Structure formats: C-alpha cells, structure tokens
C-alpha cells in the first residue's frame, strides 16, 4: 500500500468506513512490519472503544455467549466489533475458524464486524497479529469490541493486559474450575462466568467456585464477580452486560486505561527490539556461536554492545 493510499485508508477508517477498516486490518495481517502501521494509525486516532476479553477452556461456550451479547447490544442500537481467535495447528498453522460460523446470524448486519484469525500457536490466547488487530479496531466507532481468545487455559494473561474487562468462561462438568483457581486466575480476570446454566451440574459448579473465591484473597482488593448464565438467558445476559458497562466506566475513571496503554508501549518496544535483532541477522548469527566455549552471559553482553 502506497503512502497516499495508506493515509486515505486511515482517514476513511476514522470516518467510520467499514471497507477501509477491513482493508487496513488485512494490510496489518500481511505486513512484514505491522507495528509501524498501527503506530501510523495511533498518530491520528485514539483508542476509544472498550475491549472485552472472553477466554476459557474448550467447550465452555464462549462463541455462543458472545453471539447472545451481540443480539442484546444490537437491540440497543450498539455497534459491535468481534475478533475471534481460533486455535491453530502448531504444525500446519491451520485454523479451525469455527467461531465465526456460530455468529453467522449477524453477518448481514452492517453494525456488526467480525474478524476471525488463527492464534498461530500462541498459548496465551492472543497472537501478535490479534493484538495489533484489536488495537486497530479499538480506534473505529464501535461501542464494544469482543476478543475471544484461544481456549487452552494455560495462560489467560495476554488478553487481560489488553482488555478493559476480562471474562473467564467455564462450563459445568468439565473439571476445570479448581484448575482455573490454581492457575492464579483471580489475579487477571474481572468476571468468572459459569455458562450452560441449563445443565443440572451448573449450580454445583457455581457454588463451588463461589466458595473458592470467597475464601481466596484477591490481589489489591480486586472485586471479582461470579455469575451464572446460558446463551438463551436474555435477562441474565443483559444483567452481565450492564455489570461490564459499569465496571469499564469505573475503571476508566480510575486510570486502568493508562495501564493498558503502558503495556501497549512495552509491547511496541519489544517488537522493535525483536525487529532490530532480525534485521541485523543477530539471531541468525547465534547459530555460529560455540556455546561450549563461551559463557552465555558474555555472548548476550556482546550483542547488547553491538546494538549500541
């Protein structure tokens, strides 16, 4: 994309042009240097849209819940963006891309924008590409952006650092509730959502989790909420959305967005450092090092010195 065309695309994106958004997202996805594109956008636009992260284990019903949230928010005339990060094969890189199928009923709605992409094997649920695309979509005139991450469960921390509100979705009978608590999840989520409340074991799972949360000491006096619902429970899902809205509004006043921006800056620094290492073929040259004869620290110090 040429410079003038890029500037025009950014201007059109800022003006609310969906085609320009789609075009810019594709350009970011395929670019060798996506971070520079995101920076060009952020030089001319601010992140104004709250990002809601939805993570959880496989089979928890994340996509179905988001689909229900979209229906409720659309009845309120809200504009919604969705990034559905699907699991990808670590060998082939192929993505299941099943999440978008569950949301197909909204595909003809011009106030709903859904983007599916592969995780590229990122265990934390948020690949580098999805991180950048989330930031791009947050400058568009959506009222909410939902980012559904890979449901692997080893690390939900990626999305919680980017999102203004993070939901851990659990399903009854999957045996994952205690494991979730052991994983330090209290430190990184705002809402634990027991899905599929129409199942008989859901009540037991809910009370079990509630007992764990009540006994646990959440960091920094963080108020973690636990709720129970299912995709067809419009009343409860509306209550959940109201809760999210209230927390996001409060956290904005308390400066949580600043924390998110600081993380954004750190990510940019990491990406730029990595690019320098790649461009200067420093990583490639490591293959020539004799690690048996040199201290690793010596090699690292020399690389840092060469970069100065």
Question: What are the roles of these predicted feature ranges?
Answer:
Residues 191, 197-250:
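Canonical P-loop GTPase G-domain recognition
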Residues 139, 155-173, 183-193:
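Inter-motif core of Ras-like GTPase G domains
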Residues 63:
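Walker A/P-loop
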Residues 228, 239-308:
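Long, well-ordered amphipathic alpha-helical subdomains in the mid-to-C-terminal portions
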Residues 126, 153-159, 177-179, 201-205:
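Conserved ATPase-coupling elements of RecA-like P-loop NTPase cores
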Residues 5-52, 57-60, 71-155, 165-168:
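Nucleotide-state-sensitive switch-loop elements of NTP-binding domains
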Residues 87-90, 119-120, 151-153, 173-176, ...:
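Conserved nucleotide-binding/hydrolysis micro-motifs of P-loop NTPases
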């Amino acid at each position: 994309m040429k410079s003038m065309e890029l500037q025009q695309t950014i201007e059109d994106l800022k003006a609310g042009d969906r085609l320009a958004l789609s075009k810019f997202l594709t350009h970011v996805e395929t670019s060798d240097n996506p971070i520079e594109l995101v920076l060009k956008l952020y030089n001319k636009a601010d992140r104004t849209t709250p990002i809601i992260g939805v993570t959880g284990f496989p089979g928890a019903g994340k996509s179905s819940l988001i689909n229900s949230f979209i229906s409720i928010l659309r009845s309120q005339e809200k504009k919604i963006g969705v990034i559905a990060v699907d699991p990808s094969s670590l060998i082939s890189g192929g993505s299941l891309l099943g999440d978008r199928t569950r949301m197909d009923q909204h595909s003809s709605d011009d106030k709903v924008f859904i983007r599916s992409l592969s995780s590229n094997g990122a265990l934390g649920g948020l690949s580098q590409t999805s991180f950048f695309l989330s930031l791009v979509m947050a400058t568009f005139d959506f009222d909410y952006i939902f980012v559904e991450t890979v449901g692997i469960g080893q690390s939900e921390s990626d999305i919680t650092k980017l999102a203004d509100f993070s939901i851990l979705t659990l399903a009854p009978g999957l045996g994952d509730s205690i494991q979730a608590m052991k994983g330090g999840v209290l430190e990184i989520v705002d809402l634990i959502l027991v899905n599929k409340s129409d199942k008989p074991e859901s009540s037991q799972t809910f009370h079990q989790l509630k007992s764990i949360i009540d006994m646990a000491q959440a960091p920094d006096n963080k108020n973690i909420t636990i709720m129970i619902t299912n995709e067809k429970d419009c009343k409860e899902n509306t209550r959940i959305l109201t809760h999210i809205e209230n927390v996001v509004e409060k956290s904005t006043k308390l400066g949580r967005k600043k924390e998110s921006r600081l993380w954004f800056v750190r990510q940019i620094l990491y990406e730029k450092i990595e690019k320098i290492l790649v461009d200067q073929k420093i990583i490639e040259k490591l293959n020539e090092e004799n690690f048996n004869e040199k201290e690793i620290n010596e090699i690292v110090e020399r690389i840092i010195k060469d970069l100065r």
